[in-house]
Each structure stands twice: as C-alpha cells, then as structure tokens.
Amino acid sequence: AEGGAPLKMRLLKGCNLEMETVISSLRGWPNPILSTKTEVDANYLHILERALLPENAKALHIGVASHNLFTIAYAYLLSQKNNSSEYMTFEMLEGMADHVWRAQSQLGNHIILYAPVVKDEHFLNAISYLVRRMDENTAPDNFLTHSFNLKPGTDTWNFLQKQFEEAYHKKDSVS
C-alpha cells in the first residue's frame, strides 16, 4: 500500500546489437550503439558503479549479467566496498562458464542461472538466438572466446586484462 518496492535491473551488454541498429535506421532514430567495445565496456562499468551506490542499490536491485571474470570481480569488490552486495545478483547462462558461477556461489554470492525457452511456434526465434550467441561468443574481442583454459599471466589473460583496464579508465568519460 505504501509502495517502495525495489525495481530489478539486469545490466548486460552486447545483446541485440544488430537489431538495435536496424530498428533505429528504419525509424530514423540515431543509432544507440556505442562505436567501440571499449566504450560499451566503460559504459557498463559506469552504470554498475552508479547502481551499486548504497542509496541506489536499495531501490534498484541489480543483476550483473556477465561471464567476464574481470567484470564479475569488479562488481563483487564494488558491492563489498559499498555494502550493497545484498542487493546484487550475478546472472549467467546455464551451461556457459559453469565453473565461474560455482566459484561465485562458494563466495556466498547470489546467482541466477537462466536458459532461453520458446514455444514450438516460436522455434525460428530460438534459431536466430542461437546464431546470435554463436556470433557473439566467437568474436575475437569477446571474453568467452578466450575463457577456456584461461590462466593468469598468459598472453590471453594480459589481453583481457588490458581490455578491462582500458574500459575502467574511460568509465567516467562515457555517456
């Protein structure tokens, strides 16, 4: 009766990039997609930082949807620093990087695993979803492309760490 129920916001990136571009073009709108992966990552970190401030986290429960270890670690540390971890969940696709969510669970973090489900009449949507996931997950700058057998100190680790650091240093200058 008094209201005040928190909202749930799922923070993710890279989803439906092509469709956003097509729709904005068809409707004569400016393209909402940032021009580089670094800008997208920086914007994600910027929004995450704002969402996990104590005064925001209580009203806006945030789902950190990512398989990127650097992003997950940043969210974890930020939520600890801000005492806002009780208002945050980590969200991951079932069957993708299961070792990551298991480790998060052992730390006591709240985990939501999800899997796409469609009715028979929407099966074509499932095919397009799978094709999009395969395209995203095999892109050279996508974390999951490099995540198997990832070890600290390797060239791959250093590449991914550099990606994260570049985004981190730009997080306060993106819109």
Predicted feature residues:
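Positively charged, amphipathic and often flexible ligand-engagement surfaces
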Residues: A1-S175
